[in-house]
Amino acid sequence: MKIAIAGTIGRMGKMLIEAVLNTADAQLVGALEHTSCPQLGEDAGAFLGKKTGVLISSDVAQVLANAQFLIDFTRPEGTMAHLAIAEKTGTKMIIGTTGLSADQIAGLKKVSANLAIVFAPNMSVGVNATFKLLEIAAKMLSQGYDIEIIEAHHKHKVDAPSGTALKMGEVIAEALGEKLDDVAVYAREGHTGERKEGSIGFAIIRGGDIVGDHTVLFAGDGERIEISHKSSSRQSYAQGSLRAARFLQNQKNGLFDMQDVLGLRK
């Protein structure tokens, strides 16, 4: 698999490069960064003390012309710019970027008519297993339980709630026959009155170097159930991304997520 990485100097980008270099069936062929990045022209493996022969570049078209896959954990505007060029070069995309708008997601869907894309708020196998557990729990606990989603991330994360927390909310809402937009409560302050029955609450924590913690609380009378996933490193995201690339090898076009990759789709 000939793979290019976007956001090379970021925490996730470095983890992805290391994972690709240590994977037998993967080859690093490109490393992308923005035009003002001070590391442009440096070897992509320099942070590991390795010479890969792949130089960090801002020339998206040139990089994607040599890549079968682009793994992109950047920001929405960057991802959409990469997508426009990937459509022309036929480079399949694995997108872990969060915070995309409804219009941007619609753009992904449009391009996927011609290009195979995996788009998921979290590439971790464990997180996606958690989504399945939440679907089951929500159906079983649909009456008499209040649902709250608590998420914590590092102080540098720019979007809130996290894409993973929102996906958890969507999974639960769908299991209950609702739309998340109709039942979500993202903030509480002051005299809020009693909790609205059937709502799904969110609480957000930002601080330190927390990789990603998510807990869903089902609170009933006399008992509560908590389903949690805690990430200790970004390695699980990198390995999930490579698994997504392998899945896309057999796809010509279409928009997929990790439920498809893992065979969990109904």
From Swiss-Prot:
EC number: 1.17.1.8
Binding site for NAD(+): 7-12, 33, 96-98, 120-123
Principal subcellular localisation of the protein: cytoplasm
Biological role: Catalyzes the conversion of 4-hydroxy-tetrahydrodipicolinate (HTPA) to tetrahydrodipicolinate.
Annotated GO biological process: diaminopimelate biosynthetic process; lysine biosynthetic process via diaminopimelate
Listed SUPFAM superfamilies: Glyceraldehyde-3-phosphate dehydrogenase-like, C-terminal domain, NAD(P)-binding Rossmann-fold domains
Gene3D superfamilies on file: Dihydrodipicolinate Reductase, domain 2, NAD(P)-binding Rossmann-like Domain
Binding-site positions, (S)-2,3,4,5-tetrahydrodipicolinate: 154, 163-164
Record: active site: 153 (proton donor/acceptor), 157 (proton donor)
Gene Ontology CC entries for this record: cytosol
PANTHER family: 4-HYDROXY-TETRAHYDRODIPICOLINATE REDUCTASE 1, CHLOROPLASTIC-RELATED, DIHYDRODIPICOLINATE REDUCTASE
Domain of life: Bacteria
Pathway: Amino-acid biosynthesis; L-lysine biosynthesis via DAP pathway; (S)-tetrahydrodipicolinate from L-aspartate: step 4/4
Name of the protein: 4-hydroxy-tetrahydrodipicolinate reductase
Family the UniProt entry places it in: Belongs to the DapB family.
Location in the cell: Cytoplasm
Native organism: Polynucleobacter necessarius subsp. necessarius (strain STIR1)
Keywords carried by this UniProt record: Amino-acid biosynthesis, Cytoplasm, Diaminopimelate biosynthesis, Lysine biosynthesis, NAD, NADP, Oxidoreductase
GO-annotated molecular function: 4-hydroxy-tetrahydrodipicolinate reductase; NAD binding; NADP binding; oxidoreductase activity, acting on CH or CH2 groups, NAD or NADP as acceptor
Catalytic reaction annotation: (S)-2,3,4,5-tetrahydrodipicolinate + NAD(+) + H2O = (2S,4S)-4-hydroxy-2,3,4,5-tetrahydrodipicolinate + NADH + H(+); (S)-2,3,4,5-tetrahydrodipicolinate + NADP(+) + H2O = (2S,4S)-4-hydroxy-2,3,4,5-tetrahydrodipicolinate + NADPH + H(+)
The organism's taxonomic lineage, starting at the top: Bacteria, Pseudomonadati, Pseudomonadota, Betaproteobacteria, Burkholderiales
